Every structure is written in structure tokens, then in C-alpha cells.
């Protein structure tokens, strides 16, 4: 069995959310951060033949990157990677050592705060936030103009530099949603985003990839209720 580049990209992204992972039998991969404020689910091309855990996912990804197109064999306590004349063995971890997502899927509450997040817009905001050393990414409405704006700032600093870009129209109620920039660990793509009390849902718009994230919002978010 080979693991595709797309699946390795998912695992690389997941290693930024949690450095350990339990992969279940089948074609669905899920992860959750140690603080349980970021959760993600992906449906991949491969059907994994058994459950197994990886404790140090960055090391596993690095080991895989040293090979060209390895073939995987999943054994009882380890996996074997064959690459030409070379062969490597990587032992599974004890699953109980890994923080794992809940088995039951998250059901998002009803919400009228929805917008499309383009990848180039998010990249632009994140670049500006990094240059200006801004820790927070927000989504705010302007009922007067009915505009919806994504912005970067430091919420705890009244004299913070900031940057904003319009991402939608039709906002009829006032709200101001706040994320920690470091929590927006998503694979570059376009997303449909839904916001509800305390949580957000990012669903990938690429029909070739089933990928979604649930990310907690900051306590100082104002939902305009």
C-alpha cells in the first residue's frame, strides 16, 4: 500500500495540531489538539487496514520524506516501509497515550453567521498579522453597510495596529468574532465557514477532498444576540 501526497499533506497539517495521532481502520482520519480547541476530519484515498497510533507524527513524516514512494505493510506492532532495496520499520505507539477526538461527530448549532473564506484572503490576512505581530484574527459585521470583514489585531491592546479585508455582504446584525491566529491551522484552500456560540466550522470547498475543521472561538467574541 502506498500513501498519497494528499494524505501526507493532511498528516503534515495534523502534526501541527497534535504531534500524536490514532488512525482508525478505514479511510477517515481525525485529530484534536491537546487543549481540545481544534478538531479536524478528513476522508482520504487510502483504506487503512487496521487501527494504529503514531506518537511522534513529525518524525514519522520526516522519515517518510527521506523515501521516494515507499510501500507500507501494517503489521501487529509496527509498520514496514519498503523503498527500493531499502526497508524501514516504525513501531506503533500505545493509543492510550494519545489525545483522541470524540467518536460522535460534532453537530453545529443553527447559525446565520456564514461566509466563504478564500485561500488568498486568509493568506493575505495571516501575512499582515505576522509582519505586524498581531495575535488575533477576527470577523466583524457593519450593519450600516451590511459588510462582513475579516481582520487582524491584538484584542488586548487598545492601540493595536490592524488590517482588515471585506469578505462578504448581507450582514444585518452586529457581531465581532475572535480567533487566536495560532488556532487557524488549516490546509490552504477555500472554505465555507459557519460561526455559532463558541465554535466555528470550516468546510473545504474542493469537491475532490472531504476536509473540515472545528475551531473554538475566544471568550471575548460578541455574537450580537
Show where each model-derived region lies:
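DNA polymerase processivity clamps
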Residues: 1-92, 111-225
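Long, charge-dense
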Residues: 97-113
